[in-house]
Amino acid sequence: MALERLRSTLRYAGYGLLAAGAAVAASRGLRARAGKLEPPLSGDHDSYRWRGMDIHYTEAGDPDDQTLVCVHGINAAGSSGEFREIVADLAADHHVVAPDLPGFGCSDRPPLRYSAALYEDFVGDFLAEYDEPAVLASSLSASYVTSALERGDTDASRLALICPTATGGPEPPKTWLRELLRAPVL
């Protein structure tokens, strides 16, 4: 009886491994066929190298005008395309720079922990590339911008926050379990 149970368990474990392997192969195949995303905004496109990642950004307007950095919100479809309807109007009077945050839009998406600290560091470093830019930030990114400014990573000449939210809240329980479950399959 015990031998039969062991065989059954091993058989189901084999099926599970086979299914997991098929899922990984399908995911890689779909990723390879997806191709690159088109830049969401009109303008000049470039990338900013940050911590080994290529961070896509778009520039519009006269570079001699006041720089306005537009930081999009964090959501399932987040990208600098959030500013699509207003970038031309903003570029009439400003040098607009709109990055796609790490893991969003046309920017790299390496398998790492995307946290508030990561985005605060990125925003601080990116804004420091410009001489006291004006900053427009929406949603949760407004919190990242204000944290970077508060830490003194950079200065801003003006700040506009659209629907700002806070990063606060309780830490999730059992973070070690969450990290284990989110680890890539090898």
Language model segments and positions:
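Conserved catalytic-core motifs of eukaryotic protein kinase domains, centered on the activation segment
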Residues: 80-82, 107-112, 170-172
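Hydrophobic alpha-helical topogenic segments used for membrane insertion/localization
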Residues: 3-31
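Flexible "cap/lid" loop of the alpha/beta hydrolase fold
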Residues: 146-185
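Structural signature of beta-strand start/N-cap positions in the alpha/beta core
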Residues: 67, 95, 132-134, 155-158
